[in-house]
From Swiss-Prot:
This is Small ribosomal subunit protein uS19. SUPFAM superfamilies: Ribosomal protein S19. One of its GO terms (cellular component) is cytoplasm. Belongs to the universal ribosomal protein uS19 family. Keywords: Ribonucleoprotein, Ribosomal protein, RNA-binding, rRNA-binding. Pfam families: Ribosomal_S19 (PF00203). GO terms for molecular function: rRNA binding; structural constituent of ribosome.
């Protein structure tokens, strides 16, 4: 279910403050955040944001195709190791 249009998009205030601080400085650094729920705004384009996946911060470079999506969509929280492999020796018995 999508967010109500009357409410508008959401982004954490501390993340917006970090983006604004980076805009003032010449050097762009990776911005660490735990806010997977924040919507990507057009002002985020060109920045690298390290989003927490529950174990580590994964860097995500923001491009114009990502605007309107949530940060958490680009960093999966679960790692898939594949299904169990069939053992040829046990199958032959």
């Amino acid at each position: 279910m999508s967010r109500s249009l009357k409410k508008g998009p959401f982004a954490d205030a501390h993340l917006l403050n970090k983006i604004e601080a980076q805009a003032d400085s010449e050097k762009k650094q990776v911005i660490k955040t735990w806010s997977r729920r924040s919507t990507i705004f057009p002002s985020f384009i060109g920045y690298t944001i390290a989003v927490y996946d529950g174990r580590k911060h994964v860097p995500v470079f923001i491009s114009d195709d990502m605007v309107g999506h949530k940060l958490g969509e680009f960093v999966p929280t679960r790692t898939f190791h594949g299904h169990g492999n069939d053992d040829k020796k046990t199958k032959a018995r």
